[in-house]
């Protein structure tokens, strides 16, 4: 505790650079800024941004209000860390939750729900169903769980997707969203990222997956890295 989001982002950047990240992330949508390390502690997680995502972060200044900011991590609040890495040209995207001290059971339950929604989306894609069907299934599950007004943002500032294809670029298609009436092709890679946002913060999970003949194969940490980690 006591460290700023930006200080923590610096540590994450060191690890990523040492693992081969070259410094740039390609985007298909132009012009679009992208902060590859989003760290949102507590109420920073509720701040919407110009970036089409559930959690944008406050950023270091008003000229670039995206990513980690000067908020300090406090005990008892969720800390969302979303990192984009590029390995030999190929993009991966991963989110995990952290906390210091006691984290309320309400937050833990919300994370469990997001994990379940991620499984629903993944299973739908793995069967070869359309990405729009995966979106609808995930969205309906969220509404049944009581997260309809907070899924991927606080209404009306909600991102309308639950996953995005990645490859040589961060924002490839298809997307798990309405209107993408086609499946993720065999060999296609998708970052699946259900998140729920409240005034006190954000919580969720993200991994990058590839569709195989047997279903969806995880390309990032998956079950090897816990969804919630206590410092």
Regions found by a protein language model. Name each.
Residues 1-231:
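Active-site neighborhoods and metal-handling regions in enzymes and metal-associated proteins
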């Amino acid at each position: 505790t006591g460290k700023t989001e930006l200080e923590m982002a610096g540590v994450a950047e060191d690890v990523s650079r040492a693992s081969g990240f070259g410094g740039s992330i390609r985007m298909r949508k132009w012009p679009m800024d992208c902060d590859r390390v989003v760290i949102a502690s507590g109420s920073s997680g509720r701040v919407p941004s110009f970036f089409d995502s559930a959690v944008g972060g406050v950023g270091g200044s008003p000229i670039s209000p995206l990513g980690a900011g000067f908020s300090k991590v406090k005990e008892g609040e969720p800390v969302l860390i979303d990192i984009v890495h590029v390995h030999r040209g190929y993009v991966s995207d991963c989110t995990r939750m952290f906390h210091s001290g006691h984290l309320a059971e309400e937050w833990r339950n919300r994370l469990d729900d997001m994990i379940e929604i991620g499984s629903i989306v993944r299973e739908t894609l793995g069967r070869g169903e359309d990405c729009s069907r995966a979106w609808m299934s995930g969205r309906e599950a969220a509404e049944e769980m009581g997260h309809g007004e907070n899924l991927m943002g606080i209404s009306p500032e909600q991102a309308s997707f639950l996953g995005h294809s990645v490859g040589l670029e961060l924002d490839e298609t298809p997307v798990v969203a309405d209107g993408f009436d086609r499946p993720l092709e065999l060999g296609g890679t998708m970052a699946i990222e259900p998140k729920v946002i409240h005034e006190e913060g954000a919580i969720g999970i993200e991994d990058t997956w590839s569709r195989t003949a047997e279903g969806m194969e995880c390309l990032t940490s998956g079950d090897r890295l816990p969804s919630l980690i206590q410092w």
